Amino acid sequence: MEINKRIEEARKVMGKYKVDAYIITSSDYHQSEYIDDYFKGREYLSGFTGSAGVLVIFKDEACLWTDGRYHIQAEKQLKGSEIKLFKQGNLGVPTYKEYVVSKLAENSKIGIDAKILLSSDINEILSKKKYKIVDFDLLDKVWNERKALPNGKIFILEDKYTGKSYKEKVKEIRKVLKEKGANYNIISVSYT
């Protein structure tokens, strides 16, 4: 089966990086639920097309976690592959983080794409045992037909949608900065 071949290719790359497991989520750089094809590596490696799930590839097994919306779909799409399905939300089913901790010995190496996996998830795993995190994009190494990241143009929303022009907003921020004696303002968005 094609999926098993892809998993084996992933393991070969994991061997080059000397990692004991690699974690692949269904997210992009912004933790969006609906992602561009470039980020559908979990789908590429597992064959599971649901929008939510985590694939963990170990040296000796591959496991997929998904929620109740996709249990039946995942069973069908994983059939014939080596991937073991963990049905999130069912009694006694460990989370992928719990399973990684139960399976890997202390000082094991876990591969991740740190641009995608949440630091809070990694910190939760690291709080249980001492592991070495190895940051690399496994998908770039195994997914030859991977589409390029979209490269669209940005545009300015009209004032009727934003309430004020960006120039007015910047002017207001600069006024407050001056009043407070501040040199800069950091604007950030949280997706957690």
What are these regions (language model features)?
Residues 7, 11-43:
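Intrinsically disordered, low-complexity, positively charged segments
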Residues 19-20, 107, 182:
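Short, high-confidence coil segments that cap the C-terminus of an alpha-helix
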Residues 100-146:
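Hydrophobic or amphipathic alpha-helical targeting/insertion segments
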